A protein has these predicted regions:
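Thiamine diphosphate
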Residues: 1-164
Length: 164
C-alpha cells in the first residue's frame, strides 16, 4: 500500500497533488489523473513534464465512479488528459473519464495508461508496472511526445482564431 499523499488543495471535490505552470499558459496543459496507488506515479509524471517545460495538474479524484463533475470541469481547461491506473485499461477508469467528457461535450484527447487485457506472468508489482510501461518516466516520455505532436498539429492546421 502506497503512503498517503497530501493534497495541495481540493478543487471541485478533487484532490490536487501537484501543479506546474510550464510555459506560463493559462490553465494546465496536461491534466494527469492518478487513481489509487498510481497517484504517486501521477505526481512523478507531473514533475518530469515540468522539467521539460510542460505545464500540468496531477489530481486524485478520490472516487472513480461516477466521474465527478469537477473532474470534467478540470479536464475542460486542459489540452490533454492522461489517466493512470494499475487495473485493466480497457473499460477502466480512463474509459469512464473519456465517456464522461464526451457526454459533457468536452473535446479534449484522453490517453489511458493501465494494464492490457492479457494474462500476466507471475511477478512482483514493480516488475508488472515496469513491463506495462507504467513507471512515471515511461508515461512522461509518452505524454511529452503527444504534447509535441499536438503542438505540431496546431502549427500545421491553425484554428480560425489563429489565422490573423
Amino acid at each position: 500500500v502506497a503512503e498517503p499523499l497530501p493534497a495541495l488543495r481540493t478543487e471541485h471535490g478533487i484532490d490536487v497533488l501537484a501543479e506546474h505552470d510550464g510555459s506560463g499558459e493559462s490553465g494546465p496543459r496536461v491534466l494527469i489523473v492518478g487513481v489509487g496507488s498510481m497517484a504517486h506515479t501521477a505526481v512523478g509524471v507531473a514533475d518530469a513534464l515540468s522539467a521539460q517545460g510542460i505545464g500540468s495538474l496531477a489530481v486524485d479524484p478520490r472516487w472513480v465512479l461516477p466521474v465527478a463533475d469537477g473532474l470534467v470541469e478540470l479536464a475542460g481547461r486542459a489540452d490533454l488528459v492522461v489517466t493512470i491506473e494499475d487495473g485493466i485499461a480497457d473499460g477502466g477508469i480512463g474509459s469512464a473519464v473519456r465517456d464522461a467528457l464526451a457526454c459533457a461535450d468536452v473535446d479534449v484527447p484522453v490517453r489511458c495508461h493501465g494494464l492490457r487485457t492479457e494474462f500476466l506472468d507471475h511477478a512482483s508489482r514493480g516488475q508488472i508496472v515496469e513491463s506495462a510501461h507504467l513507471r512515471a518516466q515511461d508515461i512522461a516520455r509518452s505524454v511529452a511526445e503527444r504534447v509535441a505532436a499536438q503542438g505540431r498539429s496546431r502549427e500545421d492546421h491553425p484554428v480560425a482564431g489563429d489565422l490573423g
